[in-house]
Amino acid sequence: MKIALFPGSFDPVTKAHVDILKRSLPLFDKVVIGIGLNSTKAPFLSIDKRKKMLRAVFENESKIEVQTYEGLTVEFCKKINASYMIRGIRTVSDFEYEKAIAQMNHALVPEIESIFIVSKPGYSSISSTIVRDILRNNGDVKQFIPKEAFELL
């Protein structure tokens, strides 16, 4: 079984995340969305809220499951038997950053491959960081996040 992990904070999930996930599904038998718990960052949305949002967005997709994890992402890959890690790439700087991480991950656990999926042009400017800033300033984020997630804000 080809299992992939799509890790992130998803704080909140965006249409760009959804696009990358949907485009990756034909490549794998199962994709685990891994919500990483980062002790150095204060989250905007609770972990439960993020799980609910992701489950609502993908409730009709049997190949996707949502889990949380702490620690090294490659160790979580091993725990869930994922041989692949999906990463979305928006910009050249994303690529440079993700390439460095992928190389470090490969040094730690050589059997886990990083799969880069380039975002569609319409989604390349969307990031959770920008969406959070808009939310903090009472702006309208409807065009940037899936409606199922928006309904849970």
Language-model region placement:
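Nucleotidyltransferase catalytic core that binds NTPs
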Residues: 1-153
